[in-house]
Every structure is written in structure tokens, then in C-alpha cells.
């Protein structure tokens, strides 16, 4: 059994209403009792405007303390940046985590490796923990560039932060071609890339950091495939999109931690 604690994150993206978010939050909280929380860390990525509501609901739920809240993005500076949310604002609102570098931020909003790395640095310096997303597009995979792309993304982050800062990072490997498409990397494909990530970290950071850093898999994770993925040695959890909007499906994915014991 790995010493790395299994971690399952739900990324709610730009979804929900006040009513649906309340139902979902209560459902997730009910799924994670104290015993399960010892085995798996559960994080929910919440749209900015619903974060206070989710925090309020969790505070009133018996198992609410077992669920950690994450923002889905953040900006590096305060000031004249209309529409942005600064990392310090998240800290001020007692949000412990932030998801950075998600493929949708990279693809739709054209965030570069260097911009993502700067966000990671500033977030950690502010006191946040980061889920840092990396992964290749379908064209890059077909061109056999997966390792090259992932290495460049890792290098940018590593160049921006200290070795000690890695303890505040969870990596999420998300093959872009598998996100929201219904396609999923096979367990062997996912393990192969996770193993490469750990090898890169061993060679470029340290063996200790490589062994301690948790690497989630993200990309159409669902109740049907989570158990087989969880069996793989270098898969330390999941970053879940669509299935995390259904409390019952998310519960099944959280419980895939049983494959690690």
C-alpha cells in the first residue's frame, strides 16, 4: 500500500444553481464518514460565487468537515483586473485549495505553461494548496509527444517554485482528449504516463518529492472505470468532472480507494 493518501477531487466547473449545489453538497458530505475520511481526502472544486454557500452547508453537516473546498482558478495580482479573483481573496475566505492549469483554462483561455506556473507559485506563496493540471491533446498523443508535452508543463512549474513547495501540490494528469468526451485512457495508458511523471520528478527534482507527490488521473472518470484505474500503483486518486455532479456516482468513485487496501 502506498504511503500517499488517496485523493478524489470533484470539479464542478461552470455548473449548478443554488438549489442543485445545496443538494449536491449535502449528498457528498453524507458519503464521507470519519472512517472513510481516514483513507481518502475529498475535495470539491466549486464555482466562485457558490463557495460561501458550500462552506455554509458543510459547516452544518455532520460529515461536512471531511470535505475540503477548492476554487477552480485564480489570478495572481490584486488591482485593476475586472472579473478576476486574486489568490489572497481565496485565503481571506478560508478556501484551502485551488485548481490551476486545467486543460479548459489552457485551451479556451490560452493560458501558457509559464502563466500556469506563475499562478502555482503565487498561490502557494499565499498559503493555498494547488491541484496543478497537466496533460496532452489528442493530436499530441497521436504524434507521440505525450512525454514531451508533460515534461514541458512540469518543467515550467518546477522552474517557478522551490523544492519545498512541492509538498503543497497535487498533480492531476488529464489527457485532454479524454475530458468530457466519454473516452478514457485505459488503466495501462494512465499508469504509463503517471509512471513517467514520477520518473521525471525523480530525475529533475528528487526521489523524495517524486515518491511523496500525489498524482490524480482526470478524464471521463466514472463508476464503471474507477476501480480498475485505482488499482494502478502510480494513480493516487482522481479529478472528476461530470460524474462529480451526481453525488451517488461521486460516492462510488470515492470508494474506489478500497482498491488500494
From Swiss-Prot:
The keyword Isomerase applies. Keywords: Gluconeogenesis, Glycolysis, Isomerase. It is an enzyme of class 5 (isomerase). One of its GO terms (molecular function) is triose-phosphate isomerase activity. GO terms for biological process: gluconeogenesis; glyceraldehyde-3-phosphate biosynthetic process; glycerol catabolic process; glycolytic process. Coiled coil: none annotated. It catalyses: D-glyceraldehyde 3-phosphate = dihydroxyacetone phosphate. Its EC number is 5.3.1.1. InterPro entries: Aldolase_TIM, TIM_sf, TrioseP_Isoase_bac/euk, Triosephosphate_isomerase, Triosephosphate_isomerase_AS. It holds the Pfam family TIM. D-glyceraldehyde 3-phosphate binds at residues 11, 13, 180, 239, 241. One of its GO terms (cellular component) is cytosol. Pathway: Carbohydrate biosynthesis; gluconeogenesis; Carbohydrate degradation; glycolysis; D-glyceraldehyde 3-phosphate from glycerone phosphate: step 1/1. The active site is at 102 (electrophile), 174 (proton acceptor). Homodimer. Belongs to the triosephosphate isomerase family. Catalyzes the interconversion of glyceraldehyde 3-phosphate and dihydroxyacetone phosphate in the glycolytic and gluconeogenic pathways. This is Triosephosphate isomerase. It comes from Entamoeba histolytica (strain ATCC 30459 / HM-1:IMSS / ABRM).
Amino acid at each position: 500500500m502506498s504511503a500517499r493518501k488517496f485523493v478524489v477531487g470533484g470539479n464542478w466547473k461552470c455548473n449548478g444553481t443554488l438549489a442543485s449545489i445545496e443538494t449536491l453538497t449535502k449528498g457528498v458530505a453524507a458519503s464521507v464518514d470519519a472512517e472513510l475520511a481516514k483513507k481518502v481526502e475529498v475535495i470539491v472544486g466549486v464555482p466562485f460565487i457558490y463557495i460561501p454557500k458550500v462552506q455554509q452547508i458543510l459547516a452544518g453537516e455532520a460529515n461536512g468537515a471531511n470535505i475540503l473546498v477548492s476554487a477552480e482558478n485564480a489570478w495572481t495580482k490584486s488591482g485593476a483586473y475586472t472579473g478576476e479573483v486574486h489568490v489572497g481573496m481565496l485565503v481571506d475566505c478560508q478556501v484551502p485549495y485551488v485548481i490551476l492549469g486545467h486543460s479548459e483554462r489552457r485551451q479556451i483561455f490560452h493560458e501558457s505553461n509559464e502563466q500556469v506556473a506563475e499562478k502555482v507559485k503565487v498561490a502557494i506563496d499565499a498559503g493555498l494548496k494547488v491541484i496543478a493540471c497537466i496533460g496532452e491533446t489528442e493530436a499530441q498523443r497521436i504524434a507521440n509527444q505525450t512525454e514531451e508535452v508533460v515534461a514541458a508543463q512540469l518543467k515550467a512549474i518546477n522552474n517557478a517554485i522551490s523544492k519545498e513547495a512541492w509538498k503543497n501540490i497535487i498533480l492531476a494528469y488529464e489527457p485532454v482528449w479524454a475530458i468530457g468526451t466519454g473516452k478514457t485512457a485505459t488503466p495501462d495508458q494512465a499508469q504509463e504516463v503517471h509512471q513517467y511523471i514520477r520518473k521525471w520528478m525523480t530525475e529533475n527534482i528528487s526521489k523524495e518529492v517524486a515518491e511523496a507527490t500525489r498524482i490524480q488521473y482526470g478524464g471521463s472518470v466514472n463508476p464503471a472505470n474507477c476501480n480498475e484505474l485505482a488499482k494502478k500503483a502510480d494513480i493516487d486518486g482522481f479529478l472528476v468532472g461530470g460524474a462529480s455532479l451526481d453525488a451517488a456516482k461521486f460516492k462510488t468513485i470515492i470508494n474506489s480507494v478500497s482498491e488500494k487496501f
